[in-house]
Amino acid sequence: MARPFFRRRKTCPFSAKNAPKIDYKDTRLLQGFMSERGKIVPSRITAVSAKKQRELAKAIKRARHIGLLPYIVK
């Protein structure tokens, strides 16, 4: 008989009390939510809530537009 699958309870890293604010100028924080190729990692992998994922995507796109982050990494 196979082991039952237990889902790990995921909590949003931006919903905690001392959580960092999402800011387009904080490239080190934003790069943690991007793949090594420069793509935005989905929230089902990073455990970010839907609201914060939208804010995160907007901040990454804004940072890309003004040249702080690359669109694609070769």
Curated annotation (Swiss-Prot):
Single GO term (MF): structural constituent of ribosome
Signal peptide range in chain numbering: none
UniProt keyword Cell inner membrane present: no
Pfam families per record: Ribosomal_S18
Keywords from the named record: Ribonucleoprotein, Ribosomal protein, RNA-binding, rRNA-binding
Its job: Binds as a heterodimer with protein bS6 to the central domain of the 16S rRNA, where it helps stabilize the platform of the 30S subunit.
Self-association and partners: Part of the 30S ribosomal subunit. Forms a tight heterodimer with protein bS6.
The protein's name: Small ribosomal subunit protein bS18
